[in-house]
Amino acid sequence: MAQFDVRNTSEGALVIDCQSNLLRHLNTRLVVPLLPADEFEVVARRLNPLFTIEGTDYVMYTQFAATLAVSQLGEVMMNLDDHSLIIVGALDVLVTGV
């Protein structure tokens, strides 16, 4: 498992794994859901960045961050490491407001 992997959950949701690779030995992961952009409102641009996954636009709904058991995560679809500053920035907005 790698930080910023995009995965399906056992319930069919799409999530970004935001947990540090240094903590990969844990049996849980901090994830943020990716919700279809045409169905969910962007509350704040820095809090809710947009990503295109397999030709579809998704909103990172940072305010819905949660932990899931590793067993609830499916195969890796892609990795968003190239967007790490945007993802970490969204988490910073959630935690610090900045």
Regions found by a protein language model. Name each.
Residues 54-98:
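C-terminal terminal-subdomain/extension
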Residues 3-12, 16-49:
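Compact nucleic-acid interaction/catalytic patches
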Residues 1, 17, 73-77:
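Residues at structural and domain junctions
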